Amino acid sequence: MMARIDYADPSKASERTRDILAKNRNANIFRMMSHSSDYFVQYCRLGGAIRSRGELDPIVRELAITRTGILCEAPYEVIAHKRIGKNVGITDEQNEALANWQAAKCFTETQRAALAFTDEIVKLNKPTDATFKAIAAKLTPAALVELQLSVGFYIMTSKFLETFEIDLQPVTEVVG
């Protein structure tokens, strides 16, 4: 597979854009996104907040993000976030079970509620009342907002990856 348009040339980018690309290991997604340096900078700012700030449990966050990638059929996203998930404490069993999480026994009640919430956001555009109430009973309002924004952000990211047909890279090259 080859991307639908050429990746941006980092040597022609602003210093700020080059710095952000370097911090993100010049991953193909970021090289493509850097065609629009203003959007790229803001995308990375929000992505950084999602991944390193807030109170949402990182395991719940990464399960939801990886599940979003699965549902959006974005292999790049799935591969990257399974590795990120492993780095925050997701087990191999959990990563392997995500495609059919409903039948798996390796998720906590909170994780299952978050995965149901994720599925319905992606598939139905919004969760049903029952699903919303189930996750709202488990999370603080801040963590609930963070979960929804994480899913929404990674729907956008998955669609970006697939629209431009971003080339897969060895995960060890793009995720620490």
Task: Please give the residue ranges for each predicted region.
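Hydrophobic alpha-helical segments
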Residues: 1-176
